[in-house]
């Protein structure tokens, strides 16, 4: 959905000079930005949501990206690389003051000729007030790792879970369940965690567990489950990766992973190792349809041997799959 353009009456460089605008208190307080923060959590107490509703040509962000101007002040998130955030703050203050949605156009086709997008594209942004109630439901769904949609009426400004209007889908974050032993397992789990993703390493090896703790991880002990153990507690937004040098430990874990709805299941090793684990899974009675989901060799870089390169290669492959 592409938003229509409703220019704000005060260009950002002249708003402060308008007596009426200057007389209005700034309900958002000191607009100090936190571009790396959590915009959804920032709106727990209500505020203004700034949402990309349309993109023309090249741009860094896609429709559905949003940032927050919390009621208590400041801003969280970013819609550009700093090109429009100061201007959005001015519009957000007005939205908070009069509780009216504003729809803006930046870049190509915009009335704001002094705000240029270096990428050369056009960007439609809607700013609308939002109360704590729908955000509380969204946060609860995220905590439960449930898919959730907020319907945002770009005309009335109504924000209703599952309602009509622009559909803001809030998917659970990609989660990583990592099993294995050795530096490859630790490197991968640490990289995923450092990138901001939930990552849990499970290992039978105490040296691996110690190395993981040194990286700030909290590894779990591998109890070597039987082949008939319950499926892993993985949801459709979970990736399961195995980094074992002792491939005999893989089949029971892989059988449990393939019985779950995890969107990605893969194991480190050569093509020969992959064929051996496929045969082992067949002998365990795992269905061919489930085995077909197993990735191997894993990673975008063929035959990566350096642990750090392997970690980056596998992480990139998984995130590419998650975006599909």
Q: Across the structure, where does each feature detected by a protein language model lie?
A:
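Segments forming oxygen-rich coordination pockets for charged ligands
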Residues: 2-221, 230-238, 252, 273, ...
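Adenosine-phosphate binding glycine-rich loop
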Residues: 263, 268-324
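A short acidic, often aromatic-flanked loop/helix-cap motif at beta-alpha or helix-coil junctions
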Residues: 133, 225-229, 299-305
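Glycine- and other small-residue-rich loops at beta-strand/loop junctions that grip anionic moieties
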Residues: 77, 81, 242-243, 266, ...
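ADP-ribose/adenylate-binding Rossmann-like module
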Residues: 202, 239, 244-245, 255-280
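Beta-loop-alpha module in the N-terminal Rossmann-like domain of NAD(P)-dependent dehydrogenases
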Residues: 247-251
């Amino acid at each position: 959905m592409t938003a229509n353009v409703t220019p704000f009456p005060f260009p950002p460089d002249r708003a402060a000079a308008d007596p009426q605008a200057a007389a209005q208190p700034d309900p958002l307080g000191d607009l100090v930005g936190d571009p790396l923060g959590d915009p959804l959590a920032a709106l727990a107490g209500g505020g203004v949501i700034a949402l990309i509703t349309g993109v023309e040509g090249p741009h860094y962000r896609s429709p559905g990206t949003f940032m927050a101007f919390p009621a208590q002040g400041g801003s969280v998130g970013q819609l550009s690389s700093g090109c429009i955030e100061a201007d959005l703050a001015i519009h957000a203050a007005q939205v908070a003051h009069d509780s009216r949605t504003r729809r803006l156009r930046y870049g190509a086709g915009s009335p704001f000729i002094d705000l240029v997008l270096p990428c050369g594209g056009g960007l439609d942004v809607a700013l609308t007030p939002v109360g704590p109630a729908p955000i509380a439901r969204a946060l609860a769904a995220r905590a439960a790792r449930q898919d959730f949609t907020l319907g945002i009426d770009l005309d009335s400004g109504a924000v209703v879970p599952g309602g009509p209007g622009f559909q803001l889908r809030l998917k659970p974050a990609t989660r990583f369940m990592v099993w294995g032993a050795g530096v490859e397992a630790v490197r991968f789990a640490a990289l995923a965690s450092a990138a901001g993703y939930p990552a849990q390493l499970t290992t039978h090896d105490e040296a691996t567990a110690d190395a993981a703790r040194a990286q700030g991880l909290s590894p779990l002990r591998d109890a070597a489950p039987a082949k008939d153990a319950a499926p892993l507690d993985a949801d459709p937004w979970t990736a399961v990766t195995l980094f074992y040098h002792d491939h005999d430990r893989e089949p029971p874990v892989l059988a449990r992973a393939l019985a779950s709805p995890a969107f990605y299941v893969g194991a480190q090793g050569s093509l020969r190792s992959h064929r051996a684990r496929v045969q082992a899974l067949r002998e365990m009675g795992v269905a061919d349809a489930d085995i077909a989901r197993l990735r191997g060799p894993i990673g975008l870089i063929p035959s990566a041997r350096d642990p750090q390169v392997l970690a980056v290669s596998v992480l990139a492959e998984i995130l590419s799959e998650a975006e599909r």
